[in-house]
Every structure is written in C-alpha cells, then in structure tokens.
Amino acid sequence: MRKIIIFDLDNTFYNYENSHSAALNAVFSSQKEFDDYEKFFIKYEETKKKVQKRLLGNPSRHSKLIYFKELFHEKIDLQKIYELESIYWESFINSTEIDKETVNLLSNKKGSSDLYYLFTNQNTNIQLKKINTWGLDFFDLVITSEEVGFEKPDHNFFNYADNFIADYTNKKDSKIYSIGDDYRNDIKFWQEKYSSNSYLIDNNMSESKF
C-alpha cells in the first residue's frame, strides 16, 4: 500500500530555537545601533509581537525583513536592513544541525510509490533554501503558507493541501501519515479526516516509526 507522509519542517527536522538564537546573534554582531544584546532582543520581541498582531492571519507575519525594517526604522538605511535579513537567514541555515541518520532513514524507507509531502508555514523562498541546503531532497510536493495565503491551522490551508491527497485516498490504496511538532498545525486535520498514523515529535525524527 502506498504511504503518503505529510511532514512539517520547522522544529520538526531541527531545533528552531537553536537556529534562531544563532541567527539573531549574528544580526546583533552586524549592527551598531544596539550595544547590549539583551536590549536588542527585548526590542526585537516587542517589534515581532506588534507586527504579528497587525498581520494576524497573514503569512507575512513571520517575515524577518519586516521585523528588521520596523526595528531599525530611521536608524539605518534600507540596504543595511536588507543585508541584516540576509545575514539572519544565512546564519540560521548554516548553523542548523540536521540529523543525517534521519535523512538517510527517510530516503531509504521511501518506496517507489510512496509520496512525501511537506506542508509548512513561512516564506516559500526561505523554505526552499532550507530544504536544498540541508539535503532534504526527497519531497514530492512542497506547499507553503505564502503560496496558499493562509497559515496552518487555518482550514483554508488544509483544504488547499487536501486537494493533492484526496484523489489517492479515494482509491483506497493509500495510508496517510502525519509528522510534526504541533498537534493543531501538523496532525489534527489529517487524523480527523483520514485517521492518519500520527507522530508528534520533539526535534528527534529517530523516535518516529513507519
């Protein structure tokens, strides 16, 4: 029987907080407006909350470029703001530790008819950079909240993603699996609709069994 495995990316294949912390430290070291990291971090968090409240439900609410643009408003020029966002993501991606054994396991476990789908919140450009840099080249389909216009767990996101799954399940020749770090975002919809075998994990894919 065909396996359709629905993955999340962030904080599923790696520890998000470790990568984010390394990236913020790199940004702090590359600017001169703040001379104390704690003050910089507090101001960053305040800015992030303000942006996310304003853009509630909009996938752009996670944009680091928007955060930095507001954080450094009238302090540095736009070119420098753009550079800081690039520094953030370069550091984030390069500092992330991906378990190679996990990647090899997933690649080796994938049968010829199996499908690996990645459904993720975030910017499409950044998510593709992550999976390409980290060697996660086994996905048959990648869908981001940016291209859908809604974030998980919004039902509009799941309804769009489900279009790519329903045809297979209607043939009754497929089994659905869902894997992620957040029940509402990654598992609940698929479990309720397809009785998916689900794995709620904490940055350790080796705990999952197929």
What positions do the PLM features span?
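Asp-based, Mg2+/Mn2+-dependent phosphohydrolase catalytic module
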Residues: 1-3, 103, 107, 122-210
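A metal-dependent, Asp-based hydrolase signature
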Residues: 49-87
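Short, acidic loop-to-helix structural element flanking the phosphoryl-transfer center
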Residues: 87-117, 155, 159
